[in-house]
């Protein structure tokens, strides 16, 4: 069981601020969590191999190769209207004025 004083100290360390009536609820909930952790600590798992994944599938890795990442030409291919050519040249989107 966590005392109210311990709950206040933990809350302060976690930079949490509680009302006075909430501290009791927090200490009860924190005590319950600590009880659950104690139950987990009692489990004997020394003969169990640790898991890195719940499935036995191996992740397919892509080849680590350098590729071109300049997508600006593809991005500006979608620009339409009178200013499309200028937008492609200066590599900026040209929009109507929104602030006067």
Curated annotation (Swiss-Prot):
It catalyses: L-glutamyl-tRNA(Gln) + L-glutamine + ATP + H2O = L-glutaminyl-tRNA(Gln) + L-glutamate + ADP + phosphate + H(+); L-aspartyl-tRNA(Asn) + L-glutamine + ATP + H2O = L-asparaginyl-tRNA(Asn) + L-glutamate + ADP + phosphate + 2 H(+). InterPro entries: Asp/Glu-ADT_sf_sub_c, GatC. Gene3D superfamilies: Glu-tRNAGln amidotransferase C subunit, N-terminal domain. SUPFAM superfamilies: Glu-tRNAGln amidotransferase C subunit. Signal peptide: none annotated. Its EC number is 6.3.5.-. One of its GO terms (biological process) is regulation of translational fidelity. Keywords: ATP-binding, Ligase, Nucleotide-binding, Protein biosynthesis. The keyword Acetylation does not apply. One of its GO terms (molecular function) is asparaginyl-tRNA synthase (glutamine-hydrolyzing) activity. The keyword Protein biosynthesis applies. It comes from the Bacteria. Allows the formation of correctly charged Asn-tRNA(Asn) or Gln-tRNA(Gln) through the transamidation of misacylated Asp-tRNA(Asn) or Glu-tRNA(Gln) in organisms which lack either or both of asparaginyl-tRNA or glutaminyl-tRNA synthetases. The reaction takes place in the presence of glutamine and ATP through an activated phospho-Asp-tRNA(Asn) or phospho-Glu-tRNA(Gln). Belongs to the GatC family. Heterotrimer of A, B and C subunits. This is Aspartyl/glutamyl-tRNA(Asn/Gln) amidotransferase subunit C. The lineage of its organism: Bacteria, Pseudomonadati, Pseudomonadota, Alphaproteobacteria, Rickettsiales.
């Amino acid at each position: 069981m966590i005392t109210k004083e311990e709950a206040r100290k933990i809350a302060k360390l976690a930079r949490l601020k509680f009302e006075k009536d909430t501290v009791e609820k927090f200490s009860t909930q924190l005590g319950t969590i600590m009880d659950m952790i104690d139950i987990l600590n009692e489990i004997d798992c020394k003969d169990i191999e640790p898991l890195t994944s719940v499935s036995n599938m191996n992740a397919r890795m892509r080849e680590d190769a350098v590729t071109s990442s300049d997508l600006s030409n593809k991005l500006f291919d979608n620009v339409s209207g009178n200013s499309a050519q200028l937008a492609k040249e200066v590599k900026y989107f040209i929009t109507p004025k929104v602030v006067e």
